[in-house]
């Protein structure tokens, strides 16, 4: 279309770009601005209340997330049979629905990460500084430990005998399968986060951010449906760490590396895919 | 274009949308544009993720050892519908978020995409589907092979004709929803906020799965059926494969005709029969 500003100014793009018709909106001009990359290290943040407020928000969100989800898992495990509980699908809904609610609540405070893998992916895309990324990850892990701790406090005996909601590779699957499932699952989640928070996306939604959390929550729900039989679904290192620390059994720790390596690789791949292939940011001319 | 838009606004007070011009049948210029290849990559990745999550959910469910141990058929339907919602949301601005050769075919018939783009999308979708199911087989090899490979087949007790009919009507529901969600007039009514376009599309997929999982496992997406058949490579899956191409394409054709000729009355508009102003 005439006059439409091109995303990529490279030699191959000599022809005007046609707007792909499908579910795309027909925008005539660019009414969004790509935010500048965040500085790598920003000591000034440490003196701002909003920095600590964001960390506290991540702590509380992850605490509530682990409390609701692990308690749901415990309810399913202790039931006499699966039909008497909310079942595997109910567990998936607990994870996905809780992410939807919490991302909605904390999006404006901290960006609503609730997941070290999401924080890592956004850090790689230079959406936040190293200082903030590390602070968020620490607060998320602490929140997860406290959330799982409260669940154990409610029912210490049942908690220990029913697996503690910890992530382990299930019988019949190799560690390689578990790792692969975590990588692809986290890719789905972080890629959805990138799409939902993209500046261009906001412009297309006429800057109405009401539904960004919904696809993120759905992505978590869907990945849980797919991989609960394999690993109980980590795709969130804080969630896996919180349950592992409070449960504290050998087999939970044996597999624990999978739930950090897998999610971080998946997040890195999603960051690469979105920033380089979809948005082609490194190839844009600096205007 | 901007001049044309403002002119249109002047002469047609009250109508604040413009129907896009029909896409050219052959547009070789697209082949030299990065956004074309980016769209293909996006369709490939989206279909890969779609097949991985959905087929893994199917295999995980079938692996259950007792009643209610899996996510249930409802969970499988959610996996399909929810994944379409998420992926259409993510790729809408890149490629239009088709993730389904039947949707691409319907939009091609409605002249929303060129032939070159339509063929490119379909190939990317089929390749993505094969890779997605390949991931599932790699991660859960033994249960994948013993539990039907997530392939679409006609269930016992149903004839091929019944299955074909189910696929036709199911795909009609999906493609008709896609047309409604992407209609420029619809956008105008929604104040041009396309926030919810992916949601009804995802729900349409979800509800069709609720209805037809017992009949065929629900194809309504030739790439999905093709990917599972290729990786599972079982005779029965191939015997029935034609149903999962003919049915969806007929359904898409019916939806395109219904939306374009009856709801939007584009043929009648072209004739100018009902209005003196030929530019309407």
From Swiss-Prot, chain A:
Subcellular location, principal: membrane
Family: Belongs to the MIP/aquaporin (TC 1.A.8) family. PIP (TC 1.A.8.11) subfamily.
Cross-referenced InterPro entries: Aquaporin-like, Aquaporin_transptr, MIP, MIP_CS
Membrane-spanning ranges: 56-76, 93-113, 134-154, 176-196, 210-230, 258-278
Extracellular side: 77-92, 155-175, 231-257
Taxonomy, superkingdom: Eukaryota
GO molecular-function terms, A-Z: water channel activity
Compartments in which it is found: Cell membrane
Membrane topology (UniProt): Multi-pass membrane protein
Residue numbers on the Cytoplasmic membrane side: 1-55, 114-133, 197-209, 279-287
Keyword Hydrolase assigned: no
PROSITE patterns in the cross-refs: MIP
GO cellular component: cytosol; plasma membrane; plasmodesma
UniProt name for this protein: Probable aquaporin PIP1-5
Tissue/organ expression: Predominantly expressed in green siliques. Also expressed above ground, in roots and flower buds.
Motif NPA 2: where in chain: 236-238
Positions where N-acetylmethionine occurs in the chain: 1
UniProt-listed Pfam families: MIP
Residues covered by region (Disordered): 1-34
Recorded domain comment: Aquaporins contain two tandem repeats each containing three membrane-spanning domains and a pore-forming loop with the signature motif Asn-Pro-Ala (NPA).
From Swiss-Prot, chain B:
Main location group: membrane
Motif NPA 2 per UniProt: ranges: 221-223
Motif (NPA 1): 100-102
GO cellular component: plasma membrane; plasmodesma; vacuole
Extracellular compartment segments: 60-69, 140-160, 214-242
Topological type in the membrane: Multi-pass membrane protein
Factors inducing expression: By NaCl and abscisic acid (ABA) treatments.
Modified residues (Phosphoserine): 273, 276
The UniProt record lists the keyword Transport: yes
Database matches in InterPro entries: Aquaporin-like, Aquaporin_transptr, MIP, MIP_CS
Key words, A-Z: Acetylation, Cell membrane, Membrane, Methylation, Phosphoprotein, Repeat, Transmembrane, Transmembrane helix, Transport
Entry superkingdom: Eukaryota
Phosphothreonine found at: 279
Residues with PTM N-acetylmethionine: 1
Positions on the Cytoplasmic side per record topology: 1-38, 91-118, 182-192, 264-280
Transmembrane segments: 39-59, 70-90, 119-139, 161-181, 193-213, 243-263
GO molecular function terms attached to this record: mRNA binding; water channel activity
Localization (cell): Cell membrane
Sites of N6,N6-dimethyllysine modification: 3
Family per similarity comment: Belongs to the MIP/aquaporin (TC 1.A.8) family. PIP (TC 1.A.8.11) subfamily.
Description of its domains: Aquaporins contain two tandem repeats each containing three membrane-spanning domains and a pore-forming loop with the signature motif Asn-Pro-Ala (NPA).
Subunit structure, as described in the record: Interacts with SYP61 and SYP121 in trafficking vesicles and at the plasma membrane.
NCBIfam families the record matches: MIP
Protein name: Aquaporin PIP2-7
The gene coding this protein: PIP2-7
């Amino acid at each position: 279309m005439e006059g439409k500003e091109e995303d990529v100014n490279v030699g191959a793009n000599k022809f005007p770009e046609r707007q792909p018709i499908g579910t795309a909106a027909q925008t005539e001009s660019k009414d969004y601005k790509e935010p500048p990359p965040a500085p790598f290290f920003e000591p000034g943040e440490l003196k701002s209340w909003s920095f600590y407020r964001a960390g506290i928000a991540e702590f509380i969100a992850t605490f509530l997330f682990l409390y609701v989800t692990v308690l749901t898992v415990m309810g399913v495990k202790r039931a006499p049979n699966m039909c008497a509980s909310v079942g595997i699908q109910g567990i998936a809904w607990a994870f996905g629905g809780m992410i939807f609610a919490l991302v909605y609540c904390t999006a404006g405070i901290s960006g609503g990460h609730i997941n070290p893998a999401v924080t890592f992916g956004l850090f790689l895309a230079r959406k936040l500084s190293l200082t903030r990324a590390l602070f968020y990850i620490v607060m998320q892990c602490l929140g997860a430990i406290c959330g799982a701790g409260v669940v154990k406090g409610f029912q210490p005996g049942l908690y220990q005998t029913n697996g503690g909601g910890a992530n382990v590779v299930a019988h019949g699957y190799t560690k390689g399968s578990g790792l692969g499932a975590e990588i692809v699952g986290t890719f789905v989640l972080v890629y959805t986060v990138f799409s939902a928070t993209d500046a261009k996306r906001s412009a297309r939604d006429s800057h109405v951010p009401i539904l960004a959390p919904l696809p993120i929550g759905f992505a978590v729900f869907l990945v849980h449906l797919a991989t609960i039989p394999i690993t109980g679904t980590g795709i969130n290192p804080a969630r896996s760490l919180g349950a592992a620390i409070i449960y504290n059994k050998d087999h939970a720790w044996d597999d624990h590396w999978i739930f950090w390596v897998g999610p971080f690789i998946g997040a890195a791949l999603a960051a690469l895919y979105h920033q380089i292939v979809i948005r082609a940011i490194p190839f844009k001319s600096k205007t | 274009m901007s001049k044309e838009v403002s002119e249109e606004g002047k002469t047609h007070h009250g109508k604040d949308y413009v129907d896009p011009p029909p896409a050219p049948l052959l547009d070789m210029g697209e082949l030299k544009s990065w956004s074309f290849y980016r769209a293909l990559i996006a369709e490939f990745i989206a279909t890969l993720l779609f097949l991985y999550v959905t087929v893994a959910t199917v295999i995980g469910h079938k692996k259950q050892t007792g009643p209610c141990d899996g996510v249930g058929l409802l969970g499988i339907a959610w996996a399909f519908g929810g994944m379409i919602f998420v992926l259409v949301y993510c790729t809408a601005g890149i490629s239009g978020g088709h993730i389904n050769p039947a949707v691409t075919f319907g939009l091609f018939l409605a002249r929303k995409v060129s032939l070159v783009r339509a063929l490119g999308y379909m190939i990317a979708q089929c390749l993505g589907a094969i890779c997605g199911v390949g991931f599932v087989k790699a991660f859960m090899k033994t249960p994948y092979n013993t539990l039907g490979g997530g392939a679409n087949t006609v269930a016992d007790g149903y004839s091929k004709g019944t299955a074909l009919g189910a696929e036709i009507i199911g795909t009609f529901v999906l493609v008709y929803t896609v047309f409604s969600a992407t209609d420029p007039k619809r956008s105008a009514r929604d104040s041009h906020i396309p926030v919810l376009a992916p949601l009804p599309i995802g729900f349409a997929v979800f509800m069709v799965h609720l209805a037809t999982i017992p009949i065929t496992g629900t194809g309504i997406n030739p790439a999905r059926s093709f990917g599972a058949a290729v990786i599972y490579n079982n005779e029965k899956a191939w015997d029935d494969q034609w149903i999962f191409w003919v049915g969806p394409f007929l359904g898409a054709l019916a939806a395109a005709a219904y939306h374009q000729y009856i709801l939007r009355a584009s043929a009648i508009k072209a004739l100018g029969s009902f209005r003196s102003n030929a530019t309407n």
